[in-house]
Amino acid sequence: MFHDIYGHELDVLHKLAAELAERCPELASILGRDADPAMARLLQRVAFAFARVRQRIDDDVPEIIHAIFEDIDRALLEPVPSTTLVELAAHPKTLRAATVIEAGATFTDSAAHPCVFSMTEPCEVRPWALRAARVVGGERREIRLSLEVLGGAELPRAVGSDTIILALTGALPSALDLRAWLLEHATAVRAVSGTTEIVLARNVVAVPRVRDSSKQRHSLALAPLRDYFACARVFCRVALPGAQQLASLGAEVRRLDLVIELDASLPPAIVIDTTTLALHTAPAVSLASVEARVEPAGPLRFVLRTDEPDHRIVDVMDVDLVDPGSLRALTRWTPDAVLRDLDEGGGPILFEVRRSPSVLEGEIDFELSLLDDDGPVPLPLNTHLRARVLTTSAARAAGLAVGDISHATERSPVAMTFRNVTPVTRGGPPLFGGDRLWELFHRIKLGLPALTERESLGRLLSLLNGPARFGWPQAKPDANAFAPLRGLTRRRGSTIAGDEVCPGLELSLELDTASFSSHGDVQLFGELVSALLASALKPHEWVRLTLQLANGERIIYPRLFGTRGGARP
């Protein structure tokens, strides 16, 4: 490996020497390859020194950057989990008022060794049910949702917060198209009960992804794009504002309709019924942090065991040693993570997890050994460690169908039924580690310049494109450069905001839509890229994105002010 690095550095130096010889012909006699032995030795020594520096960076920087990302955005270091949308529903006679189920509630399927899914966002459950959903009128410009208040609940107490979240649960291309159509063409949301009618809102709004603020301290909006590539389904929800006005309809109301008016006819391919829409939903992932015991089972073989009833250690994605005695973890687990043995003067310890296809007894084998100049040295059998294991059931979870995740755990909400209303997506290991993490960090440091060059933006998108890296079917190409991005042009501009002149950027992306599942897919991609650009700008700066599609269509997004260091006042 060092020989390859040295050869590369030497080639670069010879290339620079040749360029200098062209500019300074009087030096050409000594700058040519092998033209002068003394110069050749000098270049070899410089190349050797550079190669040593580069090898040191390759060896040490990934560990350092990993620790830095723990503070910047820990979510990017986590595995890509299997994900679904779970719908919660109250039993008809038990819930009298709107109730918020906090993130962390868990659900499972009925298998002998089940997959456990944890909610990643709070979910507000109201004591009403969606009884019907349909498109009204020959022009298909009105969507009507029929709600029934359950049991002894009264409408004023059932309302809860001011926003009703509507999940779009049809086939993904259709759901993305419906999302785009509602966001662009909804002109009013009305509530109708008998002869009484009230206007709740003048539009439908997108539901932002809720992220754990403790995991993200950097403003650059990278994680939403990672989520988009891996599971666009989590964005298929819209919000109907103005819900608290429903209380004015009165406590005696048992049935009401929510009507969404459109200024353009809904395409016939988009189906509206109770199978393509759902209330009271939240994303849930097959990913859990589990306390485990590390028990010796041979000179080099150890077993991870857990006593937590809701989780089994199935596919290990990450292992972090806790209280390891004489060992200290300098980095989170990766396939070649290095630990240090303090008693032996800092000698490296190789820590390797062997992924097991079996889920019997909730165990998985791994190897832990001391590495010296002669190879691995076994640790004593009396070595006992504790670990925190990030585990997922990705291999099994991706085979679950709609409705399979419907069984309770010790952390499931009581007096409610639940089921997954969308298919379960695939899961995979962490996207970033080693050189990939170093490259991502480098592009973050570049900021806006890394986002306004076609090659650089394409590479950043490819780094976030987990399905392409994992080789999943129907992934957007590819893992090295984002192929659908065909061109990029930019133009500086300015606008007046109050009494301030704000500089900005008009950015146009030429996009090949063949790799996108639908027009709504393209629309969502542009929204997230626009947010990414804004997150690299200061609050007094702005960006406006335009997508140029192959069929000549243009999608123009609203001007966004920068969110770097906080939102614009």
Predicted regions and their residues:
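Extended assembly-interface regions of large multimeric machines
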Residues: 1-194
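Extended Gly/Ser/Thr-rich low-complexity repeat segments
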Residues: 101, 105-107, 158-168, 270-278, ...
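Short, aromatic- and glycine-rich surface loops/edge beta-strands on solvent-exposed regions
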Residues: 105, 253-262, 383-390
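Extracellular ectodomain segments of secreted/surface proteins
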Residues: 50-58, 75, 130-161, 273-323, ...
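C-terminal domain/tail detector
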Residues: 329-569
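Short, low-complexity Pro/Thr/Gly
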Residues: 150-348, 353-354
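Mixed-charge (acidic/basic) macromolecular-recognition segments
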Residues: 1-22, 27, 203-251, 257, ...
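Short amphipathic beta-strand/extended segments with alternating polar/hydrophobic composition
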Residues: 102, 115-121, 198-204, 399-403
